Amino acid sequence: MNMNRLMRTLEQDEGYRQFPYKCTAGYLSCAIGRNLQTVGIRYSEARFMLKNDIEDCVTDLRKLLENFDDLPAMIQEVLVNMRFQLGPGGIRGFKQMLG
């Protein structure tokens, strides 16, 4: 079996959707035909997504705070946690803290 060819075919057949949708069978699905109601998301997949989300938070904070990389690790982690929980708009509400 050629995994790459099969993946290309399934992606062509299913398409890619960034946000959840109802498939033709009525199930909540996302990505490339992932049935969220019967398959869900594996823990390893959730960890992979979390890592990507954290990297996005760090990128955003580096734009917001020019000295982000110079801050102590614990402060960086608190800021990333805040950015993750509050979203990009929410953390920008802390104007005095962000200076």
What residues fall within each predicted segment?
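Acidic, aromatic-lined catalytic clefts of primarily extracellular/periplasmic carbohydrate-active enzymes
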Residues: 1-78, 84-85, 89-96
